[in-house]
Amino acid sequence: MKASSVLLGLAPLAALAAPTPEAELSARQAQQSIDALMKAKGKLYFGTATDQGLLNTGKNSAIIKADFGQVTPENSMKCQSLENTRGQYNWAPADALVNFAVSNNKSIRGHTLIWHSQLPGWVNNINDRNQLTTVIQNHVATVMGRWKGKIRAWDVVNEIFNEDGTMRQSVFSRVLGEDFVRIAFEAARKADPNAKLYINDYNLDRPNAGKLTKGMVGHVKKWVGAGVPIDGIGRQGHLQSGQGNGLGQGIKGLGDSGVKEVGGNELDIQGNNGNEFGGGNKACLPVPACVGIPAWGVRDNDSWRPQGNPLLFDSNYNPKPAYNSVVQALK
């Protein structure tokens, strides 16, 4: 048999053995998985935000499997997405994310139960204290109950402070005052006693800012002291270039509030030079309460604010200098 015939005979076998692009991507990224590096430093995860549509797009799911140990639903668990009509739930998109995470051994952060934005009109129109209390309790119990035991942590209340540390005006604060925080957290603890319960907000990166000191830290200390079951504070990080340098002080300030956990949530940095992403993750390492950092997405053009290339991967799913800076910061 001629050599050419042998080669031709082997060609189909070689084609069958050739790895798929997704397999090649997984193998390449897993060699320096940022989630594995974060866990090697004693933390719980390096995470990202995604949803059903993104998981079915391009190489998103392959990168998440290889590089990220935690997922947060970007929109599918918000009230308007889940219960736009009272008592009628749209579970499919969030179920898809939970099923993906469970089947791939990823931790899940539920986001978010009580938020003034992306809120159905029927909730905003409530004026009766007892009615709103019941709505909060039922929504929390129903949503958390569906995935009880599958979701590690929940953002129970989200973005409730103004920049000066006062409470934001919303239907919740208007009708219930700040007592809606207690109502929501007590309902959450009852719904899933083993889940970690978080309060989440942005602009908590400046150590002397009113939102951090008077708002988040001051209120959380008071609420925890009164028995409100708050386990952790989520610090969003939707930043501009140059703002990443304050992450360390902000994380430490939150850790001083007395909560058990601090999660650096929703990190993206517009116009970053690469080094700031690494610095933001390194800032978590010396703070015992800091359990991990989630980026807010995988690649730039899928970001909620794609201008300024704020994420770790470019539009072709190639790791950027920001990705490499995280790897170096965690080694």
UniProtKB/Swiss-Prot annotation:
User: InterPro entries given for it?
Assistant: GH10, GH10_dom, Glycoside_hydrolase_SF
Q: What is an annotated GO biological process for this record, any one? A: xylan catabolic process
Q: Which residues are glycosylated?
A: N105, N301
Q: Which Gene3D superfamilies match?
A: Glycosidases
Q: What are the alphabetically sorted keywords of the record?
A: Carbohydrate metabolism, Disulfide bond, Glycoprotein, Glycosidase, Hydrolase, Polysaccharide degradation, Secreted, Signal, Xylan degradation
Query: Keyword Oxidoreductase, does the record have it?
Result: no
Got a GO cellular component term for this one? extracellular region
- Catalytic activity from the UniProt record: Endohydrolysis of (1->4)-beta-D-xylosidic linkages in xylans
Instruction: Describe what upregulates or represses it.
Output: Expressed in presence of rice cell walls or on oat spelt xylan, but not when grown on sucrose.
Cysteines engaged in disulfide bonds, as pairs: C284-C290
Locate the active site: E159, E266
Q: Which pathway is it part of?
A: Glycan degradation; xylan degradation
Signal sequence range: 1-17
The record's GO molecular-function terms, alphabetically, read:
endo-1,4-beta-xylanase activity
Q: Which Pfam families match?
A: Glyco_hydro_10
Q: Where in the cell is it found?
A: Secreted
Q: Please summarize what the entry says happens upon disruption of the gene.
A: Retains 39 percent of the catalytic activity. Double xyl1/xyl2 deletion mutant retains 19 percent of the activity and exhibits a 50 percent reduction in accumulation of total mycelial mass.
Q: List, alphabetically, the PANTHER family matched.
A: ENDO-1,4-BETA-XYLANASE C, GLYCOSYL HYDROLASE
User: Its family?
Assistant: Belongs to the glycosyl hydrolase 10 (cellulase F) family.
Entry function? Endo-1,4-beta-xylanase involved in the hydrolysis of xylan, a major structural heterogeneous polysaccharide found in plant biomass representing the second most abundant polysaccharide in the biosphere, after cellulose. Accounts for approximately 70 percent of the endoxylanase activity in the culture filtrate.
**How is this protein named in the record?**
Endo-1,4-beta-xylanase 2
- Quick one: which gene encodes this? XYL2
